[in-house]
From Swiss-Prot:
Keywords: Cell membrane, Developmental protein, Growth regulation, Membrane. This is Protein SMALL AUXIN UP-REGULATED RNA 16. The keyword NAD does not apply. Its main location: membrane. Pfam families: Auxin_inducible.
């Protein structure tokens, strides 16, 4: 599955939605005065991966990688961007996610 250039506008809108959603995650965390989670460094966002929904903090630069965009498309197809978990859930096994992110880094 390849990311099409013609869908650049759609991808941009999707990325903005993801970042907006991720900046206002869950009510269980401590937030700064701007409403951002204290445990997420600037330029990063949390994702939940695998059956146990393990939380990972990833840099926003991942949003420019075609392989990561494929995971985001799968997440949208499976969960949409509004679901009970409150954050962005990636529908793959942790081992696959860790392998992919280590290649991107």
């Amino acid at each position: 599955m390849a990311v099409k250039r013609s869908s650049k506008l759609t991808q941009t809108a999707m990325l903005k939605q993801i970042l907006k959603r991720c900046s206002s995650l869950g009510k269980k965390q401590c937030y700064d005065e701007e409403g951002l989670p204290l445990d997420v460094p600037k330029g990063h966002f949390p994702v939940y991966v695998g059956e146990k929904r393990t939380r990972y903090i990833v840099p926003i630069s991942f949003l420019t990688h075609p392989e990561f965009l494929i995971l985001l498309q799968q997440a949208e197809e499976e969960f949409g961007f509004r679901h009970d978990m409150g954050g962005l859930t990636i529908p793959c096994e942790e081992v696959v996610f860790l392998s992919l992110t280590s290649m991107i880094r």
